[in-house]
C-alpha cells in the first residue's frame, strides 16, 4: 500500500518517537495559541507543564525538538520575545560556556579519572562505603567547583566502567574497538548487565544529590549562590557561616539517608556490583598497570597537574568557569599530543545537544518572566512576617524550584526581597535571614526533579542515561527519599528557630556583623 504524503510527514515528524507522543506535541501546538488568547497566565503555566512533559519523555525523544517547537511557538504568539530569550542566554552565558568547554575538558582527563575510580571500586567492596564515598566526595567538590563539572566527571567515569564491561562481556579484549551502546552480542548476560546498570544508577544518583548537599554550603557552589551573595554583600566565609544552621544538619541527614537507602535497599537502591563485573574491572586495572608505558604515565601526570589547576582556578575564581574549561582542553591536548581535529570533535559531542536544550529552556524562563507566573506566590509569601515568613519562603521557593530552574527562581526571589527591603517592608536583618531561606530553598527541594537542578537535567539527557535505563520517572523516584529528608530537615531548622538563634549567636560573639540598608542598595545588580 503506497504511503500518503500525510503519513510520510507523520513518520518523519520527531522520527522514531511513539505516535501518541507525536500527536500530543501537535495537540500542544494547536491548543497553546487558543489558551494564550483566552488567558495568558494559564497558557504560561500550561507551557511550563508541557515542557516538563517533554523532559519526562527524554528516553522516547530528546527534549530539544519537542521542547524547541513549543518555545518557538511561544515566541511567535507573543508569550515572550526574542530579545527576552537573548537576555536570558546572555545572563547565563557562563553556564553555556561551562557546558561547551568544561565537559569537553573533562573528556580529555578521563584516563586519570578512570584510573582513580577503578582503584576505588576494585579496592572497596562494601557498596554502602562506596555510595557514601561518592556522595561525600561529590558534596566536597561541589562546595568549591560547579555541580555540572562534578556530574560531568562522574558521568565520564560511569561511561568508562560501562564500556569496559560491555567490551569484555561481548568477547573482546581491552584494547579492541567496540560499540558499547549495542546489546546485540550473544555473550552478554542480561541479568548481570541489569545488575551493573543498577549499580551505576545508584552511584550516579548518590553523586547527583551530593552536588546539591555541597553546592548549597558556599557562595561558589551554585550560580544562584553567587547572585544571592552579591545582593547581600556577603563574602565566602560569611556566606558559609550564615548557611551553616541549615546546611550542616541537612548534610548529616543527607549522608544518613544515603546509608539507609543502601542498607535497606529501598527506592531502587542497594544494587550490588556483580562479582563477574568486579573481576573484569580488576583485570582491566591489572592489565592497564602492567601495560602502562612511560608515555602513558606522562599523560596521567599531565592530567593530574591540569586537575590541580582546575580545582585551584575554580575555587579561587581565577577566571570564569567556561574559560577555565577551555584552558583544560588546551593544556591536556597540547601536552598529551591530541592534535587531530576528529579527536577533538568527539569531546564536544556529549555537551552540545544539552547546551542547545538549555538555550530552549531559557526561552521558557522568558515566558515565566514576561507572564509573571511567579508573582502571586511572591506577594503571598511577603504577606507573612518573622519566622513564619522564612518558612513560607522556603516552602514556596522549594516548590517552584521543583518545576523551574533554581538559578532563575533564586534570582527572581532575591530581587523581590531586595525591592521589599528598599521599600521598607522588611528590616536588613530579616533580609539576611530571607536570603538564607531563598538559597536553601532553591538548592535542597530542587533535587526532586531534573527541572530544578541543571546537573540532574544534564545527567538525564547524557549518553549514560539510556545505557543504564535512567529515565525521568526513575530519577524522581530515586530522588524521593532525599527530597523528603532534605526538605523536611531544612524546614525544621528554620521552623524551630535554629536559623534565627544561631544567627543571633554569631552576632553576639562577633562572628557576624550587622549589615546596613545602604550595602544592599549599593550591591551589584543581578544579571537578571
UniProtKB/Swiss-Prot annotation:
The chain crosses the membrane at residues 23-45, 66-86, 95-115, 139-159, 203-223, 241-261, 310-330, 349-369, 390-410, 448-468, 476-496. It comes from Shewanella piezotolerans (strain WP3 / JCM 13877). It is found in: Cell inner membrane. GO terms for molecular function: sodium:proton antiporter activity. Pfam families: NhaB. Na(+)/H(+) antiporter that extrudes sodium in exchange for external protons. It is a multi-pass membrane protein. This is Na(+)/H(+) antiporter NhaB. It comes from the Bacteria. Keywords: Antiport, Cell inner membrane, Cell membrane, Ion transport, Membrane, Sodium, Sodium transport, Transmembrane, Transmembrane helix, Transport.
Amino acid at each position: 500500500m503506497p504511503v500518503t504524503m500525510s503519513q510520510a510527514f507523520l513518520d518523519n515528524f520527531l522520527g522514531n518517537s511513539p505516535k501518541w507522543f507525536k500527536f500530543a506535541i501537535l495537540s500542544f501546538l494547536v491548543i497553546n495559541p487558543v489558551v494564550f488568547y483566552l488567558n495568558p497566565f494559564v497558557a504560561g503555566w500550561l507551557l511550563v507543564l508541557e515542557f516538563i512533559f517533554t523532559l519526562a519523555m527524554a528516553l522516547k525523544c530528546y527534549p530539544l525538538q519537542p521542547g524547541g517547537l513549543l518555545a518557538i511557538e511561544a515566541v511567535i504568539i507573543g508569550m515572550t520575545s526574542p530579545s527576552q530569550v537573548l537576555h536570558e542566554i546572555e545572563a547565563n552565558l557562563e553556564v553555556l560556556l561551562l557546558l561547551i568547554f568544561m565537559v569537553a575538558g573533562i573528556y580529555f582527563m578521563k584516563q586519570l579519572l578512570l584510573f582513580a575510580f577503578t582503584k576505588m571500586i576494585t579496592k572497596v567492596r562494601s557498596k554502602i562505603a562506596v555510595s557514601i564515598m561518592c556522595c561525600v566526595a561529590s558534596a566536597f567538590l561541589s562546595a568549591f567547583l560547579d555541580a555540572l563539572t562534578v556530574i560531568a566527571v562522574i558521568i565520564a567515569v560511569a561511561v568508562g566502567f560501562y564500556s569496559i564491561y560491555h567490551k569484555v562481556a561481548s568477547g573482546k579484549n581491552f584494547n579492541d574497538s567496540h560499540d558499547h551502546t549495542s546489546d546485540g552480542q550473544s555473550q552478554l548476560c542480561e541479568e548481570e548487565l541489569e545488575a551493573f546498570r543498577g549499580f551505576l544508577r545508584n552511584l550516579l544518583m548518590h553523586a547527583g544529590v551530593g552536588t546539591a548537599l555541597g553546592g548549597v554550603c558556599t557562595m561558589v557552589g551554585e550560580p544562584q549562590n553567587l547572585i544571592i551573595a552579591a545582593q547581600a554583600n556577603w563574602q565566602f566565609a560569611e556566606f558559609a557561616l550564615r548557611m551553616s544552621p541549615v546546611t550542616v544538619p541537612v548534610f548529616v541527614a543527607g549522608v544518613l539517608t544515603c546509608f539507609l537507602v543502601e542498607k535497606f535497599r529501598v527506592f531502587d537502591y542497594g544494587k550490588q556490583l556483580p562479582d563477574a563485573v568486579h573481576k573484569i574491572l580488576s583485570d582491566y586495572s591489572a592489565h592497564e598497570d602492567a601495560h602502562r608505558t612511560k608515555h602513558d604515565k606522562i599523560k596521567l601526570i599531565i592530567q593530574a597537574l591540569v586537575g590541580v589547576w582546575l580545582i585551584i582556578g575554580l575555587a579561587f575564581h581565577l577566571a570564569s568557569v567556561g574559560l577555565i574549561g577551555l584552558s583544560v582542553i588546551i593544556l591536556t591536548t597540547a601536552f598529551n599530543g591530541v592534535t587531530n581535529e576528529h579527536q577533538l570533535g568527539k569531546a564536544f559531542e556529549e555537551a552540545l545537544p544539552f547546551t542547545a536544550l538549555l538555550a530552549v529552556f531559557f526561552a521558557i524562563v522568558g515566558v515565566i518572566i514576561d507572564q509573571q507566573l511567579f508573582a502571586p506566590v511572591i506577594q503571598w509569601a511577603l504577606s507573612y512576617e518573622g519566622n513564619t515568613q522564612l518558612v513560607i519562603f522556603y516552602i514556596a521557593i522549594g516548590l517552584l524550584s521543583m518545576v523551574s530552574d533554581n538559578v532563575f527562581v533564586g534570582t527572581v526571589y532575591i530581587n523581590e526581597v531586595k525591592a521589599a527591603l528598599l521599600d521598607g517592608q522588611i528590616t536588613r536583618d530579616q533580609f539576611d535571614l530571607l536570603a538564607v531561606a531563598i538559597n536553601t530553598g532553591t538548592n535542597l527541594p530542587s533535587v526532586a526533579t531534573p527541572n530544578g537542578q541543571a546537573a540532574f537535567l544534564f545527567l538525564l539527557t547524557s549518553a549514560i542515561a539510556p545505557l543504564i535505563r535512567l529515565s525521568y520517572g526513575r530519577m524522581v523516584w530515586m530522588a524521593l527519599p532525599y527530597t523528603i529528608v532534605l526538605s523536611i530537615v531544612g524546614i525544621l531548622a528554620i521552623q524551630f528557630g535554629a536559623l534565627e538563634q544561631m544567627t543571633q549567636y554569631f552576632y553576639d560573639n562577633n562572628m557576624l556583623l550587622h549589615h546596613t540598608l545602604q550595602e544592599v542598595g549599593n550591591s551589584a545588580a543581578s544579571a537578571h
